[in-house]
């Protein structure tokens, strides 16, 4: 390998590592806040006479299969938390392949900048999400712009050979683990730092605006880091030129290799299960063990350290 190629490879590894790390930090900041966040909006809507969360709760309570005391919202809150998390995941499911295909056509760098810019706008909305629908809108924007992870991973594949690609992907796993440690920690500690007095206005600060501000700051740092340091990894002669990008997920049935198709399906079901665990774990900790945000932080610290150990030693 030429010295210039080796330099590009090292630079790409560094930029992608920090990009994935910061992306996981801002993504996981809200994990320890989810139960408190939904309870806050329920209380707010109780004061102002209803809203999106209350309507959803009433809809859930209309089913006889839900046996819950009339004065308790806990079960319904957990369901809504899962729905909010699923909203982001479903949008990521559809849009990440689109961003990935687009990056095959125009390059990794511009797509990373587009997706990170959308992520910044989503967290900017979250700062002023006095009403729950604004929070939902910010999550929609974040889900649509959530292609940076797949594109950053593709950049690793661009600069590695088949023989050493597992080492590059292990680096991705370590960045995941580190982000999973710092993100929930920042989210848990930010809960005790309030930007301003909380009001019931539609666009206003909430007890979680400080976490949103931290997320926005890190997302902007991530955007600037890619803008300044990331060099394009996909050569022009390797870029596609066939019309509009198509979501690869809809081409799954056309995969001729049966083993590859089964592997893709298995990974799909695994990620659905894992994502469900991610977004319901905090509710389990609060409901079953009465965890505080600080104790949830400690739980995610342990999970993150385990991820780092597994990815750094076993995957590598």
Residue ranges and their predicted role:
Residues 296-316:
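Transmembrane alpha-helices of Major Facilitator/SLC transporters
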Residues 137-176:
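Cytoplasmic helix-loop-helix junction between adjacent transmembrane helices
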Residues 169-192:
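Glycine-rich segments within core transmembrane alpha-helices of 12-TM secondary carriers
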